[in-house]
């Protein structure tokens, strides 16, 4: 995984520099669409087929993207470069790193919130507001429900984890009692 990140980083950074000259959000959408297409086993199979030219593979990827940027020369050059260098499989990692660069530029971060129970809109807004004060940045939350937490929430922002779940407290108590 670290190898993929290392290989994908220069591509993501180069694409981000291109995106800074235009609409970063639109470029983010395009790279996410391309990553979804590149995850399909059929696309990877076609891309590795000797019967299909590299130009055809690039055209296939761009045709599958709905973003209007896909028709632009910069997008075509980017995809053609990935195809020529046999880097299509890196698109999901490139998209992830592009999103991280975008978040960094916006002073934002993705927050994965796992709750023991479904959160209604007001509870989620209150939680996100408190978390934004704690982490000192704008958060983009994704919420999951995991009843095995018993109660509370576990929040992951980047490499930081805030676990206030009952399960974590019980595990901490168990460790203290058995030590």
Swiss-Prot record:
Primary location: membrane
Cellular component per GO, a single term: plasma membrane
A GO MF term: proton-transporting ATP synthase activity, rotational mechanism
Family matches, as InterPro entries: ATP_synth_OSCP/delta_N_sf, ATPase_OSCP/dsu
Location in or out of the cell: Cell inner membrane
Assigned keywords, A-Z: ATP synthesis, Cell inner membrane, Cell membrane, CF(1), Hydrogen ion transport, Ion transport, Membrane, Transport
Pfam families: OSCP
Membrane topology reported for the UniProt record: Peripheral membrane protein
Assembly: F-type ATPases have 2 components, F(1) - the catalytic core - and F(0) - the membrane proton channel. F(1) has five subunits: alpha(3), beta(3), gamma(1), delta(1), epsilon(1). F(0) has three main subunits: a(1), b(2) and c(10-14). The alpha and beta chains form an alternating ring which encloses part of the gamma chain. F(1) is attached to F(0) by a central stalk formed by the gamma and epsilon chains, while a peripheral stalk is formed by the delta and b chains.
Family label: Belongs to the ATPase delta chain family.
Purpose: F(1)F(0) ATP synthase produces ATP from ADP in the presence of a proton or sodium gradient. F-type ATPases consist of two structural domains, F(1) containing the extramembraneous catalytic core and F(0) containing the membrane proton channel, linked together by a central stalk and a peripheral stalk. During catalysis, ATP synthesis in the catalytic domain of F(1) is coupled via a rotary mechanism of the central stalk subunits to proton translocation.
NCBIfam families named among the record's database cross-references: ATP_synt_delta, PRK05758.2-2
PANTHER family referenced in this protein's UniProt entry, alphabetically: ATP SYNTHASE DELTA CHAIN
Name under which the protein is recorded: ATP synthase subunit delta
Organism the protein comes from: Burkholderia cenocepacia (strain ATCC BAA-245 / DSM 16553 / LMG 16656 / NCTC 13227 / J2315 / CF5610) (Burkholderia cepacia (strain J2315))
